[in-house]
Design a protein with these regions (language model features):
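Acidic, glycine-enriched active-site microenvironments
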Residues: 9-15, 22-25
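Glycine-centered tight beta-turn/hairpin loop motif at sheet-sheet or coil-to-beta transitions
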Residues: 16-18, 92
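An anion/pyrophosphate-binding glycine-rich loop and adjacent beta-alpha core
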Residues: 53-57, 63-170
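Short, conserved acidic/polar surface loops in the N-terminal third of protein domains
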Residues: 7-9, 37-40, 68
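Short loop/edge segments at beta-strand edges and connector loops
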Residues: 1, 16, 57-59
Length: 170
């Protein structure tokens, strides 16, 4: 583990646990901060700042969205359900990929991609029926099958578990 880094006219000195290493050049490979349990720290960013390098604010990217407990409890029955989606960030960035409901929230390619463009406090818009105009679809189904329930009509386009969950949410 590197404890500190100093610079002088001859290069750099790295102080390790009980040892020192000198080098003419220094490469700072900071890694990310997303996995502190695996040893991720801000040390590399601090060293970069120490030597006057510009360090941009960090944020998570390519990560799932976790949900608050009340919403998570309502949607946990959907864990493992994957649906095609179009997901849009507040800045207008759009991804057309699968969305996966998990035991912790939302994941899948669409969510992982959009997470790099999302900022805390911003909204994302998720279209779970990106290939149809829902109003037109419902009008046609109502005309062709006037006695069919909304649940059965939606189950023609969405996984049954998702339709049942949406029905429970009201």
């Amino acid at each position: 583990e590197i404890l500190s880094v100093t610079r002088d006219d001859e290069g750099y000195t790295l102080v390790l646990n009980g040892d020192e290493v000198s080098a003419n050049k220094l490469v700072i490979a900071s890694g990310g901060l997303s996995m502190p349990g695996l040893g991720a720290t801000p040390f590399g960013y601090k060293v970069a700042e120490q030597f006057g390098l510009k360090v941009l604010p960090t944020r998570a990217g390519l990560v799932p969205f976790t949900l608050h407990k009340p919403m998570l409890e309502q949607l946990q029955v959907l864990s493992g359900v994957s649906v095609p989606s179009v997901i849009t960030a507040q800045d207008g960035t759009v991804f057309r990929e699968s969305l996966l409901f998990t035991h912790r929230g939302l994941s899948g390619p669409a969510v992982l991609q959009i997470s790099s463009y999302w900022q805390a406090g911003e909204f994302v818009s998720i279209n779970l029926l990106p290939d149809i105009d829902l109003a037109d679809f419902l009008d046609v189904q109502r005309a062709e099958h006037p006695n069919q329930s909304l649940k059965n009509t939606l189950a023609m386009q969405l996984p049954k578990r998702l339709v049942e969950c949406l029905q429970q949410l009201g």
